Regions:
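N-terminal soluble domains immediately following signal/targeting peptides that reside
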Residues: 1-234
Length: 234
């Protein structure tokens, strides 16, 4: 249930940039100090550093994206404002974890968050992307962050907790097959073809779940485009 983590990061990998959307729990804002609005800083009697300097430090100290193991991308701030936490259904919240015998926590009761949108532009499409969150002195994630990654709108994974480092191998031809090197950071529907065999008292039922894009490799479906199936094509 990482979608119930106090902090949420949605990472959108696009053709020429990475778009980072953050919901920062009100009690964890200090960890993301370089995103605190200038008005808030001035109210405390302190003059904030220039935005360019704060974004540079955010890119190197707080939320890092490293492409092809060598280039650290520079963040640009798009929007920072107060909001209420977005509701993300978690069917496991409140249930008992069979391994720990502890109740699975839901989202924080305090719904106040600092909402932030940032972009990290790049000039050439990278083959790998390493994601590094804010770290503690011991080298672990400083605060719990539930995260999800999309590449050109395709979910690369399900919600998971962001570890101290996560390396993603990118497939630009078909983002469905982009993969994290860590096995615990994967989508439940990992393959484009999944078969379910149901054995019941009076029947055996075989169900096949296949992506349209993979099915087109076997037969011509006569679809007009690659992104959408028109109503008339059903």
């Amino acid at each position: 249930g990482a979608q119930s983590a106090p902090n949420i990061a949605e990472i959108h990998i696009e053709e020429d940039r990475i778009r980072l959307v953050l919901e920062i729990y009100v009690k964890d804002i200090a960890t993301f100090i370089h995103l605190i609005p200038e008005d808030w800083i001035r109210e405390s009697g302190t003059e904030p550093p220039p935005l360019e300097e704060r974004m540079k430090r955010f890119s190197t100290e707080t939320f890092q994206f490293i492409v092809d193991d060598k280039i650290r991308l520079q963040a640009e701030q798009v929007l920072v404002e107060q909001r209420l936490r977005q509701n993300r259904p978690n069917p496991f919240a409140g249930t008992i974890n069979p391994m720990t015998r502890q109740r699975v926590p839901g989202p924080p009761e305090d719904k106040r968050v600092l909402y932030a949108e940032l972009i990290y532009p790049f000039k050439t499409k990278p083959q790998t992307l390493t994601i590094i969150p804010p770290l503690s002195e011991e080298g672990w994630a400083a605060v719990p962050i539930g995260f999800i990654v999309y590449q050109n709108g395709v979910p690369v994974m399900d919600y998971r907790y962001l570890p101290e480092s996560a390396k993603l191998n990118l497939d630009w031809n078909d983002p469905w097959y982009s993969r994290f090197e860590r096995k615990d950071l994967k989508r439940w529907q990992e393959s484009g073809l999944m078969i379910y065999l149901n054995v019941e008292p009076y029947e055996v039922r075989n169900e096949i779940l296949v992506r349209v894009k993979d099915l087109e490799q076997w037969m011509n479906l006569g679809l007009k485009g690659e992104k959408f199936i028109e109503i008339s094509e059903f």
